[in-house]
């Protein structure tokens, strides 16, 4: 196996020709330091410059996969600095040889940095009160709103202009112009209102990037609320996040894999710099990943202690309260930063459900249930910057569910051949506890000479236990009690190494990843109505990957290849099950090509991915629903293989995407025959199916009104005859989204969000359409140190789950309201607060999600 991996990686090194590219975040560093970093990342060019004369020009910019020359042009920006490329050498020098520079910062009407504003400097040494002296210099602000302009005179007049804003000017003595804040001025031209704005969307490799920092998205609440505003991203009433046509995404926060969904609630929108949605992940990502979301936060380099406290209470329409309390403490001194985040959360969920199941017997059921879960989380992280290009760190997470009560009361009627046999009352008491779970991560990011090194190691342990007692009473049919207990444990060791090295005219990126997972579980039923079960799964995954990027003028291309060897052994009661054990050797290619046509960015991409069944889906135990219906896993499941082609077009605040996916051995949720009287809800593979999808999003900036409009189309093409499903489920579906966002001032904003969808077909289910509305307002005080947020979800109580599911001679229905109507109030207080930035990415991330 090791020889095969070595041969693969050697082949990747030998055959790849890579376009050298730079990816790095510069946070208020001198231009000379930025150029020095780029020089150390290339062996194609020699960069010649005088270090001292460029020290006065600060640089704040995020470079993402850019060629060396483009990267240099972007860090230089509009500073008075020239660049010349000649015979493999790049000459950079300041065009104004003066020891004095006038610097300042420009903000927009909301107090955010204003990039690309024109700055002119006029001499005022002549004492002209009108300020009409000769213009002695000019420049443009960078992404941080900062300008630096060489000057000769001691007293000057600074004038700032930007389309859509009133001109702003002031007299300055010395070299510090301070902060200048612009005021909006809408210009009427032939009846049209023209206002300056930033591009809302940008093309990214395999997807698109959305600016959060400079938009009102920074005020919507938590990271969950931000993701709910992203094109193609869906957040349901339970907080579950999916990407249209791609499933559940892998989410990274500052390149670190998110494993606890509560992190998104703890991360606040004002901490977020940008969000990148990748619908065609490259070879670096596990082959099971269909979509990736990358969240980048802002970083403050101030030293000392910072504190943030968030208190939330929410009221559900059925008279239940939930809430959370979170305290974040961080301390920074020199190169060391320590972070501690502790939280307590109470989740309150429930449903009012009507359902039916038609098999040998027909049942009509009415159920009301509620769940209360109390979780405690403790997170500790450490980062140490060895130098500007090397850092190490570690992170530990502890989680335990201290309370997990589910209470259900209901009844169901039983029919056969149209004749009612009786009524059964059902009471269900369930205790579901999670944890304690432990996760530890370590990382190293740095350089060894010109080779970039990114190493991550992870350990994870999880435990879930469940005890339930179901009591059924009936006058016509016999009484029955089912008591059960189950437990599931999981343990993971993982490591990932990514190396990058300048090679010929490009940069070679390659690496390997290894994970070892052990899970076991058992189920016992005292009355022996359902057979006891016990299973263990041992799985190892070894992967090697390589990726390159090539830039040819306005064209950009990326290609990658990932090889995975997976060996899985399945045991039942200690005996290896040969028919359920698996071994796979697969190649997963990915490629994307993009080009800029004027203001349009176009991209076409293709990849091959897999979806391995989760350990929950592979379990061999059953769950008792009622005496005519069980739920369970399927140890015989095979991995699903997906081949996708996606097209993106981006221009400013407008995006369009369209794609096609082919699924081989797709994993389906289906109802099957368990025995002569009982139906089993489980999972199975079918031969293949296909899916088409498209999305159009517009997010214009109309002054205080900043709406988002989105229309989505999706249609599956499926044949379920092999599993006995003859119903046609190939109808198209549409979703319509209107988020009416407004920002009255820097401290006051809000939104009314509307969502509607038509009937849709997914797998073997026909889902009914619905409409929902939600709203929120936010007000901050004391320079944003204190903020209040009030929100209302599902205002008209119309977000219902209604479907018809078809099986092999079995039809089931559900008409359910999940009590998503609720009101929430959050108070946040910050003292010297800065956002966290643990730099590790984690290892074995797909396995963590399966656990």
Predicted regions, residues:
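Surface-exposed extracellular loop regions of Gram-negative outer-membrane beta-barrel proteins
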Residues: 463, 565-570, 598-645, 659-676, ...
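Outer membrane beta-barrel strand-and-loop segments of large Gram-negative receptors
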Residues: 492-496, 541-543, 638, 644, ...
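Short acidic/polar hinge/loop motifs at secondary-structure boundaries
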Residues: 148-150, 223, 229, 256-282, ...
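N-terminal periplasmic accessory domains that precede
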Residues: 90-95, 175-183, 191, 223-226, ...
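Outer-membrane beta-barrel signature, preferentially recognizing the C-terminal barrel domain
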Residues: 429-431, 435, 536-539, 579-582, ...
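Short, acidic, small-residue-rich periplasmic hinge/interaction motif at the N-terminus
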Residues: 41-42, 79, 85, 89-99, ...
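Face-selective signature of the C-terminal outer-membrane beta-barrel domain
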Residues: 377-402, 427-573, 596, 600-601, ...
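Short, acidic Ser/Thr/Gly-rich low-complexity loop/linker segments typical of extracellular
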Residues: 125-146
């Amino acid at each position: 196996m090791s020889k095969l991996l070595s041969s693969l990686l050697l082949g990747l090194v030998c055959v790849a020709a890579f376009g050298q590219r730079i990816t790095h975040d510069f946070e208020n560093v001198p231009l000379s330091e930025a150029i020095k970093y780029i020089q150390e990342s290339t062996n194609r060019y020699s960069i010649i410059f005088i270090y001292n004369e460029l020290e006065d020009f600060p640089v704040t910019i995020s470079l993402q996969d850019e060629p060396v020359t483009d990267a240099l042009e972007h860090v230089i920006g509009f500073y008075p600095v020239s660049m010349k490329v000649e015979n493999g050498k790049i000459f950079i020098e300041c065009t104004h040889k003066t020891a004095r520079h006038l610097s300042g910062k420009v903000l927009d009407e909301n107090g955010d940095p204003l990039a690309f504003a024109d700055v002119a400097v006029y001499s005022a040494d002549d004492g002209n009160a009108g300020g009409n002296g000769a213009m002695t210099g000019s420049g443009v602000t960078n992404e941080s709103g900062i300008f630096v302009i060489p000057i000769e005179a001691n007293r000057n007049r600074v004038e700032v202009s930007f389309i859509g804003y009133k001109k702003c000017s002031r007299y300055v003595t010395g070299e510090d112009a301070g902060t200048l804040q612009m005021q909006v001025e809408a210009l009427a031209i032939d009846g049209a209102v023209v206002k300056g704005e930033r591009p809302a969307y940008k093309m990214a490799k395999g997807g698109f990037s959305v600016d959060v920092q400079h938009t009102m998205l920074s005020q919507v609440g938590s990271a969950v609320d931000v993701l709910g505003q992203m094109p193609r991203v869906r957040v349901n009433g339970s907080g579950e996040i999916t990407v249209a046509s791609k499933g559940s995404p892998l989410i990274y926060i500052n390149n670190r894999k998110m494993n606890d969904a509560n992190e998104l609630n703890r991360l606040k929108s004002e901490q977020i710099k940008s969000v990148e949605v990748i619908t065609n992940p490259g070879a670096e990502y596990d082959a099971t990943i269909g979509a990736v979301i990358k969240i980048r936060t802002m970083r403050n380099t101030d030293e000392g202690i910072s504190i943030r406290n968030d208190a939330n209470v929410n009221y559900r329409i059925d008279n239940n309260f939930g809430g959370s309390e979170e305290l974040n403490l961080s301390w920074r001194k020199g190169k060391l930063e320590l972070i501690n985040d502790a939280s307590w959360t109470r989740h309150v969920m429930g449903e009012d459900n009507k359902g039916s199941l038609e098999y040998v017997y027909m049942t009509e059921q009415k159920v009301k249930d509620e769940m209360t879960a109390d979780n405690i989380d403790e997170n500790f992280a450490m980062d140490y910057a060895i130098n500007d290009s090397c850092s190490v760190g570690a992170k530990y997470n502890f989680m335990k569910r201290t309370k997990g009560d589910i209470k259900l009361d209901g009844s169901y009627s039983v029919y056969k051949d149209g004749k009612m046999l009786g009524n059964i009352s059902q009471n269900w008491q369930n205790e579901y506890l999670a944890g304690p779970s432990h996760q530890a991560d370590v990382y190293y990011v740095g350089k060894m000479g010109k080779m970039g090194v990114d190493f991550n190691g992870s350990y994870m342990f999880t435990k879930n236990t469940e005890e339930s007692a179901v009591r059924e009473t009936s006058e016509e049919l016999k009484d029955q009690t089912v008591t059960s207990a189950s437990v599931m444990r999981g343990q993971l060791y993982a490591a990932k190494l990514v190396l990058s090295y300048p090679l010929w005219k490009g940069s070679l990126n390659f690496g390997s990843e290894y994970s070892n997972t052990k899970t076991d579980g058992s189920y016992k039923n005292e009355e022996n109505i359902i057979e006891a079960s016990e299973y263990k799964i041992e799985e190892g995954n070894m992967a090697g990957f390589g990726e390159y990027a090539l830039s040819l003028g306005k064209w950009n291309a990326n290609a990658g290849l990932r090889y995975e060897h997976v060996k899985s052994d399945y045991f039942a009661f200690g005996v290896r099950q040969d028919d359920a054990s698996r071994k796979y050797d697969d190649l997963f290619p990915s490629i994307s090509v993009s080009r800029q046509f004027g203001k349009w960015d176009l991209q076409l991409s293709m990849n091959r991915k897999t979806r391995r069944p989760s350990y929950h889906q592979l379990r061999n135990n059953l769950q008792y629903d009622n005496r005519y219906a069980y739920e369970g896993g399927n140890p015989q499941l095979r991995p699903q293989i997906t081949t996708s082609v996606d097209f993106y077009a981006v221009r400013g605040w407008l995006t369009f995407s369209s794609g096609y996916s082919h699924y081989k051995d797709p994993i389906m949720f289906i109802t099957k025959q368990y025995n002569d009287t009982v139906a089993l809800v489980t999972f199975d593979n079918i031969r293949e199916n296909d899916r088409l999808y498209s999305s159009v999003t517009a997010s214009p900036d109309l002054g205080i009104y900043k709406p988002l409009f989105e229309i989505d189309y999706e249609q599956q093409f499926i044949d379920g005859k092999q599993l006995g499903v003859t119903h046609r489920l190939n109808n198209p579906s549409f979703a319509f989204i209107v988020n009416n966002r407004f920002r009255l001032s820097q401290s006051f904003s809000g939104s009314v969000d509307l969502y509607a969808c038509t009937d849709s077909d997914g797998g073997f289910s026909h889902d009914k359409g619905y409409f929902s509305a939600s709203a929120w307002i936010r007000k901050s005080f004391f320079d944003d140190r204190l903020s209040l947020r009030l929100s209302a979800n599902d205002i008209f109580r119309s977000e219902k789950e209604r479907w018809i599911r078809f099986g092999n001679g079995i039809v089931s229905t559900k008409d359910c309201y999940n009590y998503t109507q609720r009101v929430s109030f959050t108070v946040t207080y910050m003292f010297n607060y800065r956002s966290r930035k643990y730099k590790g990415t984690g290892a074995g991330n797909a396995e963590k999600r399966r656990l």
